């Protein structure tokens, strides 16, 4: 068996996406708009894949990001994504060969750092990655929860629809990029794809959007979903899925979580 390593071609773009989703146990069934955005966001020259007799058996890619580092400088950041190896080709050194080629490819483009959101973090230390932040899923009983400290809130939280969210959330995101280390800047196409994803979580229904503003300036926002479980003993019961909480100062952080709780 000879494995070929190379970038995909434009004609192989849908096969690439199907292979990526298959690697995560899903089927690739995008809308036309989502497929067009996928093509623009991750073009063939941003990929590095493994082929066995023409079949895609391994995938990697790298978004072209910019992120803040300690000290406030904004630097180029290769956002590693779509890392999969087919279950039929495991333990054949395919991931190592793809990752080495992809990192060299991105270094040659002038990318200063590489970052990723690891589904299996134990894998990536061998390639030079280190843990930058922990990810936790937290369940909160809102009937018993309150903020321990509530700073002064000079602004306000208000609801917006998806169209206004698309217009004003980027400003809040940019403020958060300057406030936090590591958050990548987003292009218009990335924002369009993000809003499509936010509106397509069918298990939770339609999203709710709120923005935190001070003097009309967006400084934070939240995207969340509600699921009503029923009425028990005269009281309604339900779940809130806080999908995204973006903030750029203590006031926006507290105000948004106070709203959610």
Residue ranges and their predicted role:
Residues 1-14, 18, 26-28, 52, ...:
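Intrinsically disordered, low-complexity, positively biased terminal segments
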Residues 39-58, 79, 134, 195-210:
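A short helix-loop-beta-strand connector motif used in the catalytic cores of GNAT acetyltransferases and
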Residues 39-41, 71-72, 130:
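Short glycine-biased active-site loop of nucleotidyltransferases that positions the nucleotide triphosphate
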Residues 3-9, 13-19, 23-27, 34, ...:
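Ligand-binding pocket scaffold of soluble enzyme catalytic domains
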Residues 77, 85-113, 117-119, 126, ...:
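Acyl-donor binding region in acyl/amide transferases
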């Amino acid at each position: 068996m000879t494995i070929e390593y190379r970038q995909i071609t434009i004609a192989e773009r849908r096969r690439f996406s199907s292979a990526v989703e298959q690697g995560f146990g899903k089927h690739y069934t995008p809308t036309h708009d989502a497929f067009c955005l996928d093509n623009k966001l991750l073009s063939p020259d941003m990929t590095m894949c493994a082929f066995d007799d023409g079949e895609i058996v391994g995938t990697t890619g790298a978004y072209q990001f910019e992120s803040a580092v300690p000290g406030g400088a904004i630097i180029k950041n290769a956002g590693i994504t779509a890392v999969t190896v087919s279950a039929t080709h495991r333990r054949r050194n395919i991931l190592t060969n793809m990752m080495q080629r992809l990192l060299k490819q991105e270094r040659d483009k002038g990318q200063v750092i590489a970052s990723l959101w690891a589904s299996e973090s134990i894998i990536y230390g061998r390639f030079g990655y280190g843990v930058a932040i922990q990810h936790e899923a937290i369940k909160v009983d809102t009937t018993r929860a309150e903020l321990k400290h509530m700073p002064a809130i000079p602004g306000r939280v208000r609801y917006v629809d998806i169209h206004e969210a698309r217009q004003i959330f980027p400003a809040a995101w940019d403020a958060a990029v300057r406030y936090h280390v590591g958050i990548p800047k987003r292009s218009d196409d990335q924002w369009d794809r993000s809003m499509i994803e936010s509106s397509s979580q069918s298990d939770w229904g339609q999203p709710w959007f709120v923005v935190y503003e001070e003097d009309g300036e967006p400084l934070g926002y939240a995207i969340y979903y509600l699921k009503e479980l029923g009425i028990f003993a005269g009281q309604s019961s339900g779940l809130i899925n806080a999908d995204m909480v973006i903030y750029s100062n203590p006031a926006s952080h507290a105000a948004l979580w106070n709203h959610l709780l």
